[in-house]
Amino acid sequence: MGKVIGIDLGTTNSCVAVMEGGEPVVIPNSEGSRTTPSMVGFTDSGERLVGQIAKRQAITNPENTVFAAKRLIGRKFDSPEGKKAIGVSPFKVASSPNGDAWVEIRGKGYSPPEVSAIVLMKMKQTAEDYLGEQVSEAVITVPAYFNDSQRQATKDAGRIAGLSVLRIINEPTAAALAYGLDKVQDGGTERIAVYDLGGGTFDISILELNAGVFEVKSTNGDTFLGGEDFDQRLIDYLAKRFAESNNGLDLRKDRMALQRLKEAAERAKHELSSAPETEVNLPFITADASGPKHLTETVDRATFEALVTDLIDRTIEPCRIALKDAGIPAQQINQVLLVGGMTRMPRVQQKVKEFFGREPHKGINPDEVVAVGAAIQGGVLKGEVKDVLLLDVTPLSLGVETAGGVFTKIIDKNTTIPCKKSQVFSTAVDNQPLVSVHVLQGEREMAADNKTLARFELVGIPPAPRGVPQIEVSFDIDANGIVHVSAKDLGTGKVQQVRVVSNSGLSEAEIQAMISDAQSHASDDKKKKELAELRNNADGLIYTTEKSLEEYASLLSEKDREEIKADLERLKEVLNTSDAAVLKESFQRLEGSAYRIADAIYTGQAS
């Protein structure tokens, strides 16, 4: 039975873990880091760079390096979030044929699930390198406040990456699972608040832990609030300060300068979590008619905190709503877990302490705990982890549009999932052949203000006076938080044909095309890696052979010397070829002839 990996697919960084010997293990990537930047760089040669290597080349290739794709996943191009991304991204954000927000690289459109799949493939490869076996199953985490479209898009990303996604699990729930695994046998009930402020999203979940049962009581959040926004405030501040001393020159209009600013802002933000001030020093950041320009600015913690006060304050209202929905006052919370890199900021920790009236728990790694929880859930699903039951909730209400454009809720938010509820529909006019159902998700009173999931037409209704046909529509939310709808004619007992016209997301044909594309790129990447390794080995062989030939030429016959030199020159000629077979053949020839040097040395020593 193959291993199930747990993946935290983050906005800024991703992490992968696996259960080994009953314990979760975070897997370091090929660079030795336990987290991987969620960045993808597209090079001129068509190569796709992922993680740290993509981040390193972003400054010189900003318009072809995609970051924070998770913020676009499941979103419309003309949504407020889509428009905001356009304003701050050095890469191009474009509209797909169905209006979704995609990124455009060198004239080709890539869906956010497709970009996320490239990151997931890197995490899959990281796990396979560590385990020494193929991995095909995963548990992937999402922000608790993700809607159906965003969850489905994340599942699609997993499929494109060649993974069977066994479960989509909420990030705060995963963190609670990681925190509470060693407390499964303890008696009593523990109430936990998970405050999760990551790179792109904010979640708050209230849970109760009791004898291995992890029950989510409520969840709330903001899917467009996170470290990226904190970075942006610092970018804007530095750009403004630079403009003030350089005749209004706006660095944000220069894509390369913007990327350097972004990296500097991120670094300064990290440093200000442990130091009272930091210096941002960017020489030759741009130039004008008067010559090159340099940016040097000292930023102290108080200045940074003032820039982001409103962002931190925005996290408090969801906390208040979550406690109210759970029916638990703040003083009854036993533990507050801090999750996500932004919770390292002292002002964030102080705000959490002020609101909950207690010191938050800092005994977990905020960057790794979510992946650890996902791995544990994988262990639960495979039967490796016993005596653990996870009861999560749907973050948003599910309902339909009724007369007058009103949103009628059928499944309320914070209902434990999986769950199923039904509603009976009928016809409004005589002999009506179909009933249209508009399914939505959200909390607003009017249908137009909520998120459309799909429109269903229940067709083939037998002719009858209005109000007579009884069509039962069942709404089913699975354990992944993904919505399924079925319909049944109560009069005939027949299941009605349901035509689903989803207004967003990828079609099955698009997903299959992306799977093929990903597989082809994976094959290309493997060939490139093998060629690079072969080239490195050949380069090493050339060096050692030349050195040995120079040192031990006198031990060789003239014929052997000439043959080795000929093979050496041949390998040098083909060293930069892209034909692996030609390079391998020349490598093996020189390897064989160079063996004569070792043979001659051995014979010489023996005599």
UniProtKB/Swiss-Prot annotation:
Protein name per its UniProtKB record: Chaperone protein DnaK
Pfam families: HSP70
Disulfide cysteine pairs (residue numbers): none
GO molecular function per UniProt: ATP binding; ATP-dependent protein folding chaperone; unfolded protein binding
Function: Potential chaperone for other proteins involved in social motility.
Keywords: ATP-binding, Chaperone, Nucleotide-binding, Phosphoprotein, Stress response
InterPro entries per record: ATPase_NBD, Chaperone_DnaK, Heat_shock_70_CS, HSP70_C_sf, HSP70_peptide-bd_sf, Hsp_70_fam
Record PTM Phosphothreonine, positions in chain: 201
Induction: By stress conditions e.g. heat shock.
Gene3D superfamilies: 1.20.1270.10, 3.30.420.40, Actin, Chain A, domain 4, Substrate Binding Domain Of DNAk, Chain A, domain 1
Family, per entry: Belongs to the heat shock protein 70 family.
